């Protein structure tokens, strides 16, 4: 899959809580040894891989397909990949008002472990805190 195809899928999945990445960001991601772009049908994730940690920078499902359990299935695959990779834990940030995503992460035993004040800018331009969540894999 080309970097442009990854980017176009990302644009279908992005929502008001997402960090906005550009095509140039995706080109840098493809060259990085520590960044992995995972794709599964109409889902995409951007992961940072370090010694014993996987950080989910972005995970999304195409808007037209949300509410069908695809995000849960994809997250389960990311967790399995992280275990195979040898990670001890997974971290991510989620908007404080993104209740569906917070509930999904909690259902996989992610726990809240911090807050990033004014981390996201939503479509109206106002700021929103992000909750840092962590899943221990051991």
What function would you assign to each model-found segment?
Residues 125-138:
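Terminal substrate-recognition subdomain of acyl/acetyltransferases
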Residues 62-68, 96-97:
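Active-site acidic-Proline motif in GNAT/NAT acetyltransferases
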Residues 6-64, 72-77, 81, 85, ...:
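Acetyl-CoA-dependent GNAT
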Residues 71, 75, 97-101, 118-124:
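Short glycine/proline-centered loop/turn elements that form peptide/ligand docking sites
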Residues 77, 104-107:
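Structural preference for long, well-ordered alpha-helical segments within the folded cores
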Residues 93, 106, 111-126:
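Conserved catalytic-core motifs of GNAT/GCN5-like acyltransferases
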Residues 56, 90-94:
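Conserved hydrophobic beta-strand within the GNAT/NAT acetyltransferase core sheet
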């Amino acid at each position: 899959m080309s970097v442009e195809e990854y980017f176009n899928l990302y644009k279908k999945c992005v929502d008001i809580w997402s960090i906005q990445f550009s095509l140039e960001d995706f080109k840098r991601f493809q060259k990085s040894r520590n960044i992995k772009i995972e794709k599964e049908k109409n889902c995409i994730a951007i992961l940072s891989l370090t010694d014993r940690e996987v950080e989910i920078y972005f995970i999304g499902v195409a808007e037209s397909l949300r509410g069908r359990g695809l995000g849960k299935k994809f997250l389960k695959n990311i967790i399995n990949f992280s275990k195979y990779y040898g990670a001890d834990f997974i971290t991510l940030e989620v908007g404080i008002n993104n209740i569906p995503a917070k509930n999904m992460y909690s259902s996989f035993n992610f726990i809240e472990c911090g807050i990033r004040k004014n981390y996201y800018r939503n479509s109206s331009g106002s700021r929103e805190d992000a909750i840092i969540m962590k899943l221990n894999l051991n």
